[in-house]
Amino acid sequence: NGIRKLMERAVPQGTPESMIVKVHETFTEHYKKHCADKTRPYDGIKELIENIRNAGVYTAVVSNKADYGVQILCKDYFPGLFDYAVGEREGIRRKPYPDSVNEVLRQFDVDRTQAVYVGDSEVDVQTAANAGMDVCMVGWGFRDEEFLKENGAEFVVHSPEEAWEFINK
């Protein structure tokens, strides 16, 4: 999980550490300039986040993407819609460790029992469990419903409207 792990998986087995470092540096330089290429929010997501905010609920992003990429994407695609965003950075272990979630909860001074984790991958299922939070998995993102359920998801929504119903209950 995370960019470094992606680089390790992308190069041939046995690649020297110095080359992995160079590949990581090259990727990072490229990604900083192009992280939003061919990216867009799923239909209905901005409206979902607006509904959540209009209900007086804090909104946040936790991601294994590099923190600079998370900040850029939130600013470009969701200006003013997230109260906090945290990506991969020093001092915070990547998901499925709950570190990023715990940071968000501390930032807002909110108890985990009053929060809902929304995710689209098996790593998100694990992260929510590790954080001791209710989870709303979405079936239109990185993984489909069947895969999510095979990997521990108990409940999967199929639209932003269904997600809002789950969050708003």
Protein language model regions, located:
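N-terminal helical cap/lid subdomain that shapes the substrate entry/recognition surface
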Residues: 1-47, 54-58, 68-71
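Surface-exposed amphipathic alpha-helices with a cationic face
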Residues: 46-54, 125-130
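Short acidic capping loops at alpha-helix termini that bridge into adjacent secondary structure
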Residues: 18-19, 80-84, 112-116
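Conserved Lys-Pro-Asp/Glu-containing loop-to-beta segment of HAD-superfamily phosphomonoesterases
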Residues: 95-125
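Acidic, Mg2+-coordinating phosphoryl-transfer loop and its flanking beta/alpha structural elements
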Residues: 116-157
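A short, structured active-site edge motif that brings together acidic residues
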Residues: 79-94
